[in-house]
Amino acid sequence: MASFLLLPSSLRHVSFFHPRACPLLKLRFSSTAHMAEQRTYAEAIKLLDSLQSNRAVVSSISSTPSDMNLNAIPEMLEWTRKAGYQPKDLAARGLKYIHVAGTKGKGSVSVMVENILLQYWRSKSRPEALGRIGLYTSPHLIHVRERIRIDGLPISEALFTRYFYELWDRFSLAEEGPDSETKPGYFRYLTLLAFHTFIQEGVGTAIIECGIGGEYDSTNILPQEAVTACAVTSLGIDHKGMLGETVEEIAWHKGGIMKAGVPAFSSEQIPEAQAVLEERASEKGVEFTVVERSSALEDLKLGLEGDFQKDNASLAITVAALHLKTLGVTEVTTSTELPEQFITGLETVRWPARCQYLIDGTTEWLIDGAHTLESIASTAAWFLEKHTSATAMRAPWSRNLLPPYGIASYMRNRSDPGI
């Protein structure tokens, strides 16, 4: 028997912009001894969960986002300062970044780039210019530590706890008065925690996925000189309360990650979205390229299923190749045959709950998540492809399908602010 699981949209909306939308819970420890006793991973998670939630932010600003959008980056820079960093410090020790935005596929592109680069880092030659590989994504599936990865693995509970409290103490020392906000909100805290962790752990390359949008996203404080490439994945309508009602408005926000002098790339877009991205690139003095599906993928079996993943893989190939070239590691001609490291990276990449096929006893699961109508269509196409293939092979499960789960949840949540 096979089941089809479409994750509810609520699992997909876990990023935000603005901490002033509602009061933060102000937490105090009564004594140093008490603080020491409570400094466990479990307590760190409780403190993190007490911070302003993403959904609260979306709900509070959905009707009047303009002013708070304009305040987003200045506020994030102030929190960065309170964390002990200036923007230029994010480039400490030669740390280089790849910045990824988009509506659909930005997590997939990010993890593909990570796995390609890991093949070079794990090789016998181990190029020092590349350095350890960091990845920051959202949301997480099970554990919040999944959002911050180093060398392909989530950071440990011990490391998360250590760096979480280092930032917590810095924010506490920076409190300016009884009415001031004492801590950044959930997504901002995790973003700063990722930067802090990467710097402290000596990461050389970090792939950073935007939370919501791009122009005013908390990740958009990266120093221009530290970014080797910006990528925009497929665009669609999402987070309307924060990004706008049209794909043109949304494209404007996503294109906000482009940085002067840094090459920017995009998957193929609908004409309206592509035109806006081209305008933004022109405004910022950016060399902008639309990446077509690579012919080198025709005979390649990607680790992530779904035909649309070939578009994501094409973007990942282009971005990874430029990053390697910029660092002087290798020059890759991606228009023909791919290097072994690229092939291995794309074939072995894994990203749970993204077009994932699982066998559990006698039940076979087809699992994906979607938060836009276009994403649901892509998920349905993948499911149909699997079902058609199974039917052709007369697979037993093709005749015993459980009804899809999650469609009703998605439709019910379509009225939620910012979705």
Task: Tell what function each PLM region has.
Residues 2-102, 108-131, 136, 176-178:
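Short functional linear segments
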Residues 60-73, 77-78, 86-94, 119-225, ...:
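ATP-dependent carboxylate-amine ligase catalytic core
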Residues 76-79, 113, 117, 191-198, ...:
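Buried hydrophobic packing segments
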Residues 99-101, 134-137, 208-211, 233, ...:
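Short beta-strand segments
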Residues 133, 264, 287-289:
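Hydrophobic beta-strand scaffold residues
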Residues 205-208, 218-231, 235-239, 249, ...:
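Nucleotide phosphate-binding/pyrophosphate-handling subdomain across enzymes
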Residues 212-284, 416-418:
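Conserved catalytic-core segment of NTP-binding enzymes
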Residues 291-295:
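Beta-strand-loop-alpha "switch" segments that mediate conformational coupling across diverse proteins
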